[in-house]
Amino acid sequence: MFIDKAKIHLKSGKGGDGAVAFRKEKYVPAGGPAGGDGGKGGNIIFVVDEGMRTLMDFRYKMHYSAENGENGKGRMQYGKDGEDLILRVPPGTIIREEKTGHLVADLTQPKERRIIAKGGKGGKGNVHFKSATRQAPQFAIAGVKGEELTVTLELKLIADVGLVGFPNVGKSTLLSVVTSAKPKIADYHFTTLTPNLGVVRTKRGDSFVLADIPGLIEGAHEGTGLGHEFLRHVERTKLLIHVLDVAGIEGRDPLEDFEKINEELKLYNEKLSTRPQVVAANKTDVMGENENLKKLTEALAEKGIEVFPVSAATKQGLDELLDYVSIKLKELEDTEVELEEVEEEKLYELKEKDTNQFTVKKEDDTYIVEGDFLERLIMSTNFEDMDSLTYFQKVLRRKGIIDELKKLGIEDGEFVKIYDVEFEYFH
């Protein structure tokens, strides 16, 4: 099972409701308004953690909620803001909105932070609604709902060098002897199901991150086997070490394998076909008398690709291979791996829709009006209080709802329904 993709549900905190409260003072109607504002809802923030290597944590928990803001209080006391929820992810994590597929964030830098779900604003207390004609407002405004969305997390492995090749050619063994990584090693296809990372330190004193990319098979670019998941990890490496079995233990032709794997890389992503490569001709310790190595070296020399005879089992030839890779990486230092462009405008779509958007439709003899801000307004209105009712009507006019009802031909005596509240319309 791959641990490089996960789907999770996010819900940021709701803003706290404004309070209806009054002071106790002489000669002030009803004591004067003193309801404080609600606190802001908590954000959900993703932070890059260099110590993480997988999305394993998100396999065991799928729902994440930030804290709601506290409601306002009397004596003009504001509610406390909800605490932000911090979710830590490995470097290289891509976040997409599951519903639309839009790219929300591409997190690569250490300690990089990104707000993915923004907390709702706190509501206004009744202290804000006092006027010359409204001395003791009996209403306040509810807090705004937090954003709620499902996202897909995708980990694109960040490594300097990737080991590619068919299953069972010795990639995991190679990684284990040149780094401190301890991948599972066995003689069967698809041995490596998740990428393994290790840090190589050469005798020259250089170091780089090496990734054992899970094995490929023909048809991988179409998703055959575990193809798409495997190929996804190759995209951000600067250089590839193509591991081939020159001993031909399973009857394979190393040159044919080289061509097949490169064709899969090209079909998956055209840019991968131009990624610098070096070949590790592995299992020379059990090669015996065959022409595979000579044939391979001559054919790849025409393509300008270096071939290093090695044995991961005996460590023969590995120092020369790693020194070459280290030098090559220095030549590629200025090469930047292309990242997908982050669509910044997609970050707070849900928040933007809360402000003024509404819909009006007629069903039978009733006009149905809906909108996020209207749900808030209904929750905030005291329909037994004339001041509150007057404010409610004022908002309907200011937001253009009355004009829209008129365009649809509403007449006096017809019914309007806004969520759970239904009333007769009179001009």
From Swiss-Prot:
Domain OCT: 347-427
Example of a GO MF term: GTPase activity
GO annotation, biological process: ribosome biogenesis
Enzyme Commission number(s) of this protein: 3.6.5.-
Compartments where located: Cytoplasm
Protein's UniProt keywords contain Amino-acid biosynthesis: no
Start and end residues of each OBG-type G domain: 159-330
InterPro entries membership: G_OBG, GTP-bd, GTP-bd_Obg/CgtA, GTP-bd_prot_GTP1/OBG_C_sf, GTP1-OBG_CS, GTP1_OBG_dom, GTP1_OBG_dom_sf, OBG_GTPase
Subunit structure: Monomer.
Family: Belongs to the TRAFAC class OBG-HflX-like GTPase superfamily. OBG GTPase family.
Name of this chain's protein: GTPase Obg
Species of origin: Alkaliphilus metalliredigens (strain QYMF)
Gene: obg
